Amino acid sequence: MTAKTNNMILLPDDAIVVTNYNDLDRYLDKFAEGSLDLVLLLGKPGIGKTESVKQALGIDDCRQSETLYVEGHAQPFGLYQGLWRYRNNPVVLDDLDRLYANPDHVRILKPLCNTRRAKRISWLSNAVTGVPELPTEFTTTSNVMLIANEWRSLNGNVRALEDRMIILWFKPTVEEIHRKTAEWFDEPEIYHFVGSYLSHIPQLSMRHYERAKRLRNAGFLDWKKSLLQMMLSDRTVAVVVGLQLDPLLSNETQRIKQFTAETGLSRATYFRVKA
């Protein structure tokens, strides 16, 4: 399979680009109802991929779910046991980036991700003898969702999986991420502060809001300055903007002195960036 580049991210040619949460929910709802049997969801960290999937499938961390939800740190034999216990139920494998790298995981994923309705999964080792009810092979009709931050073809087995999947590249704009965050984030001061800088933020993460909340609640008066350094890719711009927000600096002379101390750059650079 060839690949295309989307803002420096390598993607399979047949990836479907999804740019808003409403459209993402349409695909997730179809998966939840069983209409889509095999989906690979790609997207950068901090945009709510996992939360959206859990909401669509009714997965609640506080109670038992009918969906098998597996994170990347799971061991291969543990994955096999989970697939047996949840056979014929939906399966979500999160953090596929880790699972990719383990050949034992890939050997399980290859038959699991077969496009046939009934898929035969096997574990050919003595480990199953320690779990009396666990067979060495079984058949399941589970539909499967794989979640990853990036797409990588490490070997032929992985490429074989890609050829079978509906591949979604979730790429919401910073405005869309900000809008979605309003549905759950309950700190107006932080929310509106982030919103005032959206046009300058190249890549927004929902984690930025939570980090700012932790800094502010810990008593850091300069939490806004710290947040800008996290969000803005140009550190010089972040420093200049942060200096305007520093309550301990009351005039330009103090700000310029602090700017040159932090960056080693000149007074002229300070005014150029500020402009």
Predicted feature locations:
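Conserved AAA+ ATPase small/helical "lid" subdomain
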Residues: T181-D234
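N-terminal pre-Walker A segment at the start of P-loop NTPase domains
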Residues: T2-S35
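AAA+/P-loop NTPase substrate/partner-engagement loops
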Residues: I47, I59-P90, D97-N102
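A short beta-strand-to-loop transition that corresponds to the Sensor-1 phosphate-sensing loop
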Residues: D95, L124-V131, T141-R152, K171-T173
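Short, amphipathic alpha-helical "recognition" segments used to contact nucleic acids or chromatin
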Residues: L28-F31, D234-T253
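Conserved catalytic/switch belt of AAA+ P-loop NTPases
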Residues: A101-T141
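Walker A/P-loop nucleotide-binding motif
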Residues: E33-S52
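A short helix-turn-beta junction within AAA+ P-loop NTPase domains corresponding to the substrate/partner-engaging
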Residues: N155-E176
